């Protein structure tokens, strides 16, 4: 099937009522002795956030905001792919593919869409198995396969040449597009990209050494999220799909841990309603299992961890205060055409400081052929 069908988000009211009912009937776990953020989301914090979700968060308002942009669904490789397609009023505008991370989903790019649509034709898909790109119809959604699907999507929309921006997992897919279809790309723009460390560690700056230490701490103390989903996706799916409290804790912890390191609480970096929009989409679509499956697919891809061809497409790297990329290893992976470091923000900088991302994207692509 190559047809493209209009799509509109319209969550049934009984689903919204069921969510609120579950939140108000939560069976709260007792707080562990000495439990602070280092052990996970504190009970008192989560209880207050859950009450806000149940009583103050307005899903219908968010739904209207999400529906302000044209949305569509198509099928590629047997998989439904949901995407926003926002045409610029500029007839000569270049096309820009925007790729999300997790948590965050395509919602994590919401605040940069209207400003960027003045200068670009935007295509904003959900990854297979995320959000409304469901149900997941097969396994094996490796980074190369996802990249091939999005290259096909851009072809289907009539964009022979385009740019791509991605953060985190979206950065990995963006760079893979640079390997698969370099002749079609006018440039790549990425943030929250993690370049695998090399052996050349001599001469690292103090800032680079601090980034290495952050990665080491994450591997020791923060990698459980990835390990659980990449090894037992079905097991964790049972918990997250049936308990909105469990899902809320699972997602909000990552927003807190991976956002601006200066923030003491997640909402000091990312607005509550933005975090709850992502959690709500995951809840209403029932995609906890398919999201976990995507981690399993990537982790079990034999080609994921070995050497890769260097990306020759001009690539801009954006580093927030919480990023860990080291330039010499980024240059090993890609043709670094622009390198921008900010003193604030984290992995979700498009949510935390959208104006920084908007400006950097515009400046980078302004003179790309």
Name each model feature, range by range.
Residues 144-162, 172:
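Conserved acidic catalytic loop of the alpha/beta-hydrolase fold
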Residues 59-61, 107, 127-141, 175, ...:
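Glycine-rich "HGGG/HGxG" loop immediately N-terminal to the catalytic nucleophile
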Residues 229-369:
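C-terminal subdomain of alpha/beta-hydrolase-fold enzymes, centered on the catalytic histidine
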Residues 102-113:
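The serine-hydrolase catalytic nucleophile loop
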Residues 115, 119, 159-210:
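Conserved hydrolase catalytic core segment
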Residues 92-101:
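Short beta-strand element of the alpha/beta-hydrolase
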């Amino acid at each position: 099937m190559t047809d493209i069908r209009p799509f509109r988000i319209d969550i049934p009211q009984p689903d919204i009522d069921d969510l609120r009912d579950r939140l108000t009937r939560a069976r709260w776990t007792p707080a562990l002795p000495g439990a602070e953020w280092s052990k996970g989301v504190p009970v008192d914090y989560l209880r207050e956030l859950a009450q806000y979700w149940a009583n103050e968060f307005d899903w219908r308002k968010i739904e209207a905001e999400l529906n302000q942009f044209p949305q569509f669904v198509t099928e590629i490789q047997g998989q439904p792919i949901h995407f926003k397609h926002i045409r610029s009023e500029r007839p000569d505008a270049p096309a820009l593919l925007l790729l999300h991370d997790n948590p965050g989903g395509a919602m994590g790019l919401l605040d940069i869409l209207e400003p960027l649509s003045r200068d670009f034709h935007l295509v904003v898909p959900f990854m297979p198995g995320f959000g409304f790109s469901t149900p997941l119809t097969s396994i094996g959604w490796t980074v190369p396969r996802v990249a091939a699907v999005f290259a096909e999507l851009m072809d289907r929309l009539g964009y022979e040449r385009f740019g791509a921006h991605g953060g985190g997992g979206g950065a990995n897919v963006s760079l893979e597009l640079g390997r698969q279809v370099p002749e079609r790309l006018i440039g790549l723009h990425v943030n929250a990209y993690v370049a695998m460390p090399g052996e050349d560690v001599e001469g690292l700056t103090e800032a680079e050494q601090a980034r290495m230490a952050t990665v080491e701490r994450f591997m020791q103390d923060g990698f459980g999220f990835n390990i659980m989903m990449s090894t037992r996706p079905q097991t964790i799916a049972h918990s997250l799909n049936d308990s909105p409290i469990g899902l809320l804790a699972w997602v909000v912890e990552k927003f807190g841990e991976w956002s601006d390191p200066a923030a003491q609480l997640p909402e000091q970096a990312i607005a509550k309603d933005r975090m709850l929009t992502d959690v709500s989409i995951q809840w209403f679509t029932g995609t906890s299992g398919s999201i976990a499956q995507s981690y399993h697919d990537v982790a079990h891809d034999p080609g994921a961890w070995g050497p890769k061809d260097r990306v020759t497409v001009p690539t801009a790297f954006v580093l927030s205060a919480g990023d860990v990329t080291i330039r010499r290893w980024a240059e090993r992976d890609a043709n670094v055409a622009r390198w921008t470091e900010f003193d604030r923000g984290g992995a979700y900088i498009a949510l935390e400081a959208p104006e920084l991302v908007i400006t950097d994207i515009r400046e980078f692509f302004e003179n790309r052929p």
